[in-house]
Amino acid sequence: MGQANRNRPGLSIMAANKNAPASPPIRKTTRIPIPTEPPQEKWREQMEGIRSVRRSRDAAVDFAGAGALRDSSAGSEDDVRFQVLMSAMLSSQTKDPVTAAGLNRMRQACAPAPLGAAALLATGMDEDALTELLHPVSFKKTKAKHILMVCKRLAEAEDGRQAGAIPDTVEGLLELPGVGPKMTYLVMDVAWGRNEGICVDTHVHRISNRLGWVDTWNRNRPKAQNPEKTRKHLQGWLPREHWSEVNELLVGFGQQVCFATRPSCSACGISGLCPSADRHGDLALPPSK
């Protein structure tokens, strides 16, 4: 009987498992509830201070951001809105002046016709040609692929939307290839003039955490950030009338003063109101709560 048991592989595995070290306990992630009250009681003073710092409106976002690139004389309303969408798609992880230059090259490629979905397709550019045109935009090949896919989709009328028009809903924009939440809320605001949500980019995500407006920074994995979490937390308490303003306000502030590394706290007009002021380190975040 004992010999038979020794020949049964299942028993030997079970015996080995008994001697194996116990698996480490699974660490549960604590979810931070979305706040409905301002986490930072001085947020109004902070925002007013940033407005003062940004009074000159001479940051890159002010002359090369999506709002600045919106040209009402650049074709029909459909063309203008399409160009806003293009600038948003080009902008991901790309500096504003590079985005602006890329959009202008797309406009020139379509001339004398205004830049629109059908006009861009009519140039006959394939993915490789458009990739070359977009250089040095970041992730140019992926963006060229998505742009052509979007053009082919928008050039045809569908679901009550006329040919050449971009979707006028959050859901419709999110269905487009390469278009995420950040781009969607920016396009809804700039192209359609509708305040549907906060556009949270790397500047808004970083500075909101530094100011104490949210506590959403991934300290364990700094390269794995979640701007969508920041958007939801900001929208939980920030009055809606500030949603449209907060993107350009913080983006320009981040471009000129509150840099990703080594922020210029000594030259900042709100350092006395900032819990992260003069903290040393790569990101200068406030103490962990």
Go through the PLM ranges and name each one.
Residues L120-L134, L173-L174, Q225-Q235:
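Short, well-structured alpha-helical segments that form the helix of a local strand-helix-strand
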Residues M1-I166, E241-H242, L249-V257, T261-K289:
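N-terminal polyanion-binding entry modules of DNA glycosylases/AP lyases
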Residues Q83, S87-L90, H146-R153, A165-W217, ...:
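Catalytic DNA-binding helix-loop module of base-excision-repair DNA glycosylases/AP lyases
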